[in-house]
A protein has these predicted regions:
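Short, solvent-exposed loop/turn segments in extracellular or other extracytoplasmic domains
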Residues: 95-101
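C-terminal motif of bacterial Sec signal peptides marking the signal peptidase cleavage site
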Residues: 17-20
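Active-site-adjacent mobile loop/cap segments within catalytic or ligand-binding domains
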Residues: 440-443, 448-450, 462-465, 491-551
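Solvent-exposed loop/turn segments at secondary-structure junctions
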Residues: 379-382, 419-424, 446-451, 468-471, ...
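Stable alpha-helical elements in mature extracytoplasmic
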Residues: 168, 369, 392-395, 399, ...
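Active-site histidine-acidic residue metal-binding/catalytic motifs
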Residues: 355-440, 450-453, 457-459
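Signal-peptide-cleaved, periplasmic/extracellular N-terminal interaction regions immediately downstream
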Residues: 22-33, 50-69, 75-78, 89, ...
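Bacterial N-terminal signal peptides that target proteins for export
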Residues: 1-13
Length: 551
């Protein structure tokens, strides 16, 4: 599961389930394992283990800060499936292999610890597991320390009230004045060669989600700097935040550049066509995918396009249209003859180039023949660990290797982003894949839950995408995994994940099962279940490409 791992797990849960497990008091009884869906075979049987009693808590780790409001889960192993276990006096389910997981009320704030007692006949093992809670700030309201009577300074008449409102408006007007640009900055250092792999990230708030992806060398007005972020202006109606280190100050007397979209043209390009938009200095932009078009929003730009020249051999672009949305915002809409398959954005000779990728030729009898598929075994770095110590990165490499074999048997060439236990940076995995011109990217992961979620409510299978053109692949792979694994169908989810942000190919991330659940962790150790996971993904990839010509 990629970082940040827990936000995605919450997304996958039905809203009612989240609400139910957030406020309800958990029952001390044992929750049943989920029933398999459809006609898929059940999970493999859990092997019997009967070793020495040894209590090992995997989660939460010792002295971890637990953020749940009133209840949480705890899991690990005790060495024997024949033993019983209580945690703070509550019976916990012990699985045949000695794994345990239970969901119970949080320990009291003054004694934040779990007391675990494992018993098998005359043998007993005990452990104390200490956790911590977040330090909560105590907000002191003025009303809590002010006298009960109304202070004389508060307005008491209608005239006083109006005067106070005018003062607030004047204060707000002064604040808006202070938001005028204080200078110009360049976002990163531009590259002489075409480089689509380096981007500067724009966020709606400091520390927020990734939304805009700017080309290094883009020049924008600076509004201010705070807490490691630079606030920049895209146009009069939109300000965003970038890392302060990415905003390089330019000379104070630098004149503002005029950015005007001139006549555009469409030309043939490797693996597709280019839409060329002459603009001058680099500008911030945003690309939106629609059903059969791509819309490029250009910030701080005026449109003055008279002619669009179309490549004589182009079969992808139908029309190119432009509008002036606001005095400082232009939009260029590229209407296509089919749904987008992939694209890149880069700068060339002071022009923004939108490179559209053509679809591969598909043999309906052998849809994967001649295609290159990137298989990305998730982690390390990071990753979850199951109750008996199965590390996510170990399991995903085994499953990914099986997936490679199956795809190759069906005619594909496979690019593995890793083949060993060595860590590969998240950002490098899409770069490998883009440079290899893969036709699809599939990242294999195992899921987990955030603090406070009842792990027995909806433990199943989910698939994630970020770019709109990746959604059909996500749906087909989700169908394939659910059919093979037989777990609860958690559906297809949009999520802003690093490895699926690539635009040149469809990219998805699979969460086939939950490694933190004892029965699913045990299944993930078996060759049978590993093969089912891999085969479900392969079936989905094959079905996606079989249906690609009709999309």
């Amino acid at each position: 599961m990629p970082l940040p791992r827990f936000a995605r797990a919450v997304l996958a849960l039905p809203l009612a389930a989240i609400v139910a497990c957030a406020g309800a008091t958990p029952a001390p009884g044992i929750d049943p394992a989920p029933r398999p869906s459809g006609g898929a075979p059940p999970l493999p049987p859990i092997p019997q283990v009967d070793g020495p009693l040894a209590i090992r808590v995997v989660y939460p780790s010792a002295n971890a800060v637990v953020t749940s409001r009133d209840s949480n889960f705890i899991f690990g192993s005790i060495g024997s499936g024949r033993a019983t276990l209580t945690i703070n006096g509550v019976a916990a389910r012990v699985y045949p292999n000695g794994a345990f997981m239970t969901y119970l009320v949080n320990p009291p704030a003054d004694t934040p610890r779990y007391e675990l007692v494992a018993t098998r006949g005359a043998d007993t093992a005990r452990a104390t597991h200490v956790i911590r809670y977040p330090v909560r700030d105590v907000a002191v309201l003025d009303s809590a320390v002010a006298p009960a009577a109304k202070p004389d300074s508060l307005p008491t008449t209608r005239a006083d009230t109006i005067a106070a409102l005018h003062a607030r408006v004047d204060s707000l007007r002064r604040q808006l004045t202070r938001d005028d640009p204080i200078g110009w900055v360049q976002l990163g250092q531009p590259s002489v060669a075409m480089d689509t792999d380096r981007t500067i990230i724009g966020k709606p708030i400091p520390g927020g989600t990734y939304k805009w992806f700017f080309t290094p060398g883009t020049i924008v007005p600076l509004l201010g700097r705070t807490a490691g972020y630079a606030r920049i202006r895209l146009d009069h109606d939109l300000d965003v935040y970038v890392d302060s280190a990415d905003a390089i100050d330019l000379p104070a007397n630098m004149p503002a550049a005029r950015r005007i979209v001139q006549n555009m043209r469409v030309r043939g390009a490797p693996l597709g066509v280019d839409v060329i938009m002459p603009l001058g200095p680099r500008v911030p932009y945003f690309v939106e995918e629609l059903e059969r078009s791509l819309v490029v929003t250009l910030y701080g730009v005026r449109a003055n396009t008279d002619i669009v020249n179309f490549a004589p051999q182009d079969s992808m672009v139908r029309t190119v249209e432009w509008t002036q949305e606001t005095p400082e915002r232009a939009k260029v809409t590229v209407n296509l003859r089919a749904a987008p398959y992939g694209y890149l954005v880069f700068w060339e000779n002071n022009a923004l180039v939108l490179r559209l990728r053509g679809r591969p030729a598909i043999d309906q009898r052998h849809p994967l023949a001649g295609l290159t598929i990137a298989v990305d075994p998730g982690h390390p770095p990071g990753g979850a660990t199951g109750p008996t110590g199965l590390y996510e990165g170990t399991a995903t490499l085994v499953i990914g290797t099986r997936l490679k074999r199956i795809l190759e048997e069906r005619g594909a060439t496979v690019l593995m982003t890793r083949t060993t236990d060595s860590a590969i940076a998240l950002g490098d995995r899409p770069i490998f894949s883009r440079r290899a011109n893969v036709h699809a990217f599939v990242s294999i992961h195992l899921n987990a839950y955030p603090d406070g979620v009842n792990p027995f409510v909806a433990p199943g299978t989910g698939t994630y995408f970020f770019r709109t053109h990746s959604e059909p692949l996500a749906r087909e792979v989700q169908k394939g995994m659910v059919a093979q694994l037989g777990l609860i169908n958690l559906g297809v989810n949009y999520d802003n994940l690093a490895v699926v942000r690539g635009t040149w190919y469809p990219a998805i991330l699979c969460e086939g099962a939950f490694v933190i659940l004892p029965d699913q962790e045990a299944a993930l150790r078996t060759p049978e279940f590993q093969e089912r996971y891999a085969r479900g993904v392969a079936d989905g990839v094959e079905n996606y490409f079989r249906g690609l010509p009709s999309r």
